[in-house]
Regions:
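Short, small-residue-biased leader/transition segments that mark boundaries at the very start
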Residues: 1-6, 382-384
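Short loop/turn motifs that recur once per blade in beta-propeller domains
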Residues: 16-29, 71-81, 127-140, 181-190, ...
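Beta-strand-rich domains and repeat architectures in extracellular enzymes and scaffolds
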Residues: 23-55
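Beta-rich catalytic cores
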Residues: 31, 55, 82, 87, ...
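Beta-propeller blade termini
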Residues: 32-42, 83-93, 143-153, 194-202, ...
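Solenoidal tandem-repeat scaffolds enriched in leucines and small polar residues
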Residues: 125-129, 135-172, 179-220, 229-231, ...
């Protein structure tokens, strides 16, 4: 009954997504934000990590058709902190992915509680920031997003923290110490950080695109492990917009990543690299302003074409299929419309190993709502051009 306030009744013939929210055990209304995917306990299976804003952080594991919270250690669930962002990657090359929880108990500037950087010793989690050697490098600035960056291409990840009203952080492990290298790398800019993504955008290594609010976006070119800011040179600065969710996608199916980025109640962008400049090829339907929070690009229905999921807060979500030549075709999103959904984050993973991606959406901010979970209804009889 509680979940009916989020979803809409749509005939089966119109559904792109099947609603499988019933698979989530003990799915109570709550305030959630960012979602990540990781093998939390190194058991060979992925979990959805869901942040809680004054609620437990969750590690949703799959077993026999059910998603259940698999971690109950107090340092992980951290109910008394307000967690807004999460990323997971192996920063020390020990085979376990560390988990960075970004806490934000104030809108902007200085905050009370620092972030968590959780390591797993095979039995329990511990916070690397609680070690005395790392106390001088705590992030005590409000933030919005966090992403892992393999800047040297050697598998030793760093963590970029998009702060709001304070300098950007870039944490790496140096010996036994967690060091903020943002100043050394020249990326300690002060802005209204909102979203951040990393991948091979321009160089052969991990570049960084950061969508910001009340200021220009950043595009960092990875020059042998150092960063050069080129947003204005490549025409992705979008100075007068308020950036939100962003994703990387091979929009032209040509073997290179381009940038999908959104703006709060402003035009959404599909930046494609042409002649050493990014050109926005978004059509009227795709670019239509909305109260957007998250953008995801993935092939949900295994037809060889990527879909773009746009998660809005307080208004309907949208779904587009990227066809050949960068054509965006809006498709009926079906059960995942969520007209009254207060979307704050989302992630995709093949959580049950059946070869089809699940979509998990988190909600909150202005009201308590449960998580929702969707799976594409694949029509096997329909031909697919790209997979023949």
């Amino acid at each position: 009954q509680r979940q009916m306030c989020i979803r809409d009744s749509i005939s089966k013939s119109d559904d792109f997504f099947e609603d499988i929210t019933y698979q989530i055990l003990e799915n109570q209304p709550r305030l959630s934000y960012g979602v990540s995917v990781s093998d939390v306990n190194n058991d060979g299976n992925f979990e959805f990590i869901v942040t809680g804003f004054g609620f437990n952080n969750l590690a949703l594991a799959h077993k026999k058709g059910i998603l259940f919270n698999s971690i109950n250690q107090s340092i992980f669930i951290d109910k008394n902190r307000k967690t807004i962002g999460v990323a997971s990657c192996d920063i020390d090359q020990d085979g376990y992915e560390e988990i960075y929880f970004l806490n934000t108990d104030t809108y902007s500037g200085n905050k009370r509680y620092s972030d968590r950087l959780l390591d797993f010793d095979g039995n329990k989690f511990f916070d690397l920031f609680e070690l005395e050697i790392n106390q001088k490098n705590l992030n005590l600035t409000a933030g919005r997003s966090v992403v892992c960056v393999d800047r040297n291409g050697n598998g030793a990840y760093g963590i970029y923290v998009a702060n709001y009203g304070g300098p950007t952080r870039f944490y790496e492990k140096d010996g036994n110490e967690i060091i903020d290298k943002a100043s050394e790398l020249g990326i300690d800019k002060i802005t209204g950080g909102r979203a951040v993504i990393s991948g091979n955008i321009l160089s052969g290594r991990s570049d960084i695109f950061a969508a910001n609010e009340r200021g220009e976006n950043f595009l960092y070119y990875n020059n042998n492990g150092n960063f050069v800011e080129l947003a204005k040179d490549y025409a992705v600065d979008d100075t007068f917009q308020n950036g939100r969710g962003t994703a990387l996608s091979d929009i032209y199916y040509r073997g290179r990543l381009d940038i999908l980025t959104s703006n709060w109640e402003g035009p959404h962008r599909a930046f494609v690299l042409k002649n050493n400049k990014f050109v926005d090829i978004a059509d009227k339907q795709f670019s239509a302003p909305s109260r957007i929070r998250t953008v995801i690009s993935a092939d949900f229905d295994n037809d060889g074409y990527d879909e773009v999921f746009m998660n809005n807060i307080g208004e309907p979500n949208k779904l587009f299929k990227i066809l050949d030549n960068g054509e965006f075709k809006e498709i009926n999103i079906g059960n995942a419309l969520e007209t009254n959904g207060l979307g704050t984050g989302a992630a995709v993973a093949d959580i049950d190993g059946d070869g089809i991606l699940e979509l998990l959406i988190s909600h909150g901010e202005s009201g308590y709502q449960p998580l929702t979970l969707y799976l594409s209804l694949i029509h096997i009889s329909e031909p697919t051009r790209r997979l023949n």
